[in-house]
Structures are given as C-alpha cells and as structure tokens.
Amino acid sequence: MLNLSIMPLDTEHIDEIVADIIEQQKTGVSTHAMFMMEFNPEGTPAVNKAEMQCKKYDLFRERLDKSGARHGVLVQATLGHIYTPYEPYSFQPTVSLNNGEERVVTCCPLDPDFRKYIKEQFRILAERHPAVVMLDDDLGLFYRPTNGCACKHHMAEINRRAGKAITREELYQHCLGDTEEDKYYADLYVDVVRDSIVDCVKAMREGLDEVDPTIQGVVSGIYTSTFCEFSDYTAEAFAGKGNP
C-alpha cells in the first residue's frame, strides 16, 4: 500500500526536508515523499512549468536516491483550481452551461492544444523517473460554478453524437427539463464531459509512457464531497499498464 507524504519543493530548506523524508520512511510513517508541482498553464505561449519545477526536483532526487529514499510528484494543478493565472493563456477556458460565461481559472480538457501542452509537461516530468505521479482533485468540472463545460469543443462533440445541432441555451433548458428528450441530452452532456476529462488524463499518461511506462499513476480525491468526480474512470486511465 502507498502511504504518501506531501512535500514542498523548497530548496532553501533542502537539508531539513531530505532528513525528514528519510526519517519518515525509516520509521514507517510514509512510503514515498511526493513533491508538489503545478502544470496548469500560464502565459502565451505557455510557460514550461514542468522544466522549471523539475530543476528543483533534481536537487532533491540526487540526495534521496543516494539514501535509498523513495519519491514521486503530486501534480497539484492540471486543469486549474480556483486561482486566476498571473498571465493569460491561449487555450480554451471552461464555459458555463448556465450563462455562457468563460471561467479562466480552469482549462477545457477537450481543447486539443491544451492536451498537447499537458502531455508534454508529463513527458518532461517522466524524464526524472519518479516512482509515483499523483493527479490532484482539479480534474472535475461538474462541481464548479460552470456546471461542466459548454464551450465550442464540448458543444461540437454533443452535436456530433446527437446528429443534430443545438445551442448551449437549448442544452441548458434540456438539463432542467423532465421529458425523454431532456433526459437524453442531459445524459449525453454528462457523457461528453466525462469522456473529455478521461481522454485528457489519457494524454497525460501518454506523456509518461513515452519515457517511462513503469511509473505508477494515482488519482486523488476528497471522497466525502463532490471532488471524486469520475475518479474511477480517471484512476484507471492514469494508473499505467500493469499497475494497480
């Protein structure tokens, strides 16, 4: 069983942190130290966050590998949590089903350009060969004020599967209704949002697999609330071939 201990990439206190990690694993408090990173995009073009943070990770890896201590990475943000980026990005943000407003704190997981970006971030991380990589609970979309995502990418996929074109406003009304047609579109919307998240996670996994397919993938969640959205699907997609 994994017993993960979250650690900061604080190079100013590297000696104390490394000593703490070694002691934790020696005494059975934890099995792995998980260093926090954030890959949610910022800037146009997007800043290479993975490379910047992995340079700090390298300093810890060198010391921990010599001691035999095990370590991995918690990617604390991929789509984005609740914080507005310091610099705007060029990817598609999520769009509210209710009113059509963009919410820039979260990227749309169906945007093909975002998927290319996030896959490359995980490929760069995999070059450091962490034993475990964990995704944080910002993968969900339905628990957010947007009630999923009704951007151009999601609406196009809904219309493709339905075989007819409807607007965001019509989709919203269907999600409020109780007819058979309403239920069809509400279920279709859930399916499309779920698949967009899962396929985005698969892109992240592909980034790892291009370098090191043995890395154990883990998905976190707060299982007493709504933050476990589709985590059974995403955990399977991210675990890696042959991993639990």
Role assignments for model-derived ranges:
Residues 2-12, 38-54, 100-119, 181-198, ...:
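The substrate-binding groove and active-site-proximal loops of carbohydrate-active enzymes
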Residues 2-6, 32-34, 71-75, 133-135, ...:
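Hydrophobic faces of well-ordered beta-strands that scaffold small-molecule active sites
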Residues 7-11, 37-39, 76-80, 138-140, ...:
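Active-site beta-loop-alpha junctions enriched in small/polar residues
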Residues 9-25, 113-125, 229-240:
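Short, acidic/polar
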Residues 14-41, 127-132:
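Catalytic domains of carbohydrate-active enzymes, especially glycoside hydrolases
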Residues 20-21, 37-91, 200-208:
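Aromatic-lined substrate-binding rim segments of carbohydrate-active enzymes
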Residues 70-128, 141-145, 152, 158, ...:
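Active-site-adjacent "subsite" loops/lids of carbohydrate-active enzymes
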Residues 143, 197-244:
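Substrate-binding cleft/loops of secretory-pathway carbohydrate-active enzymes
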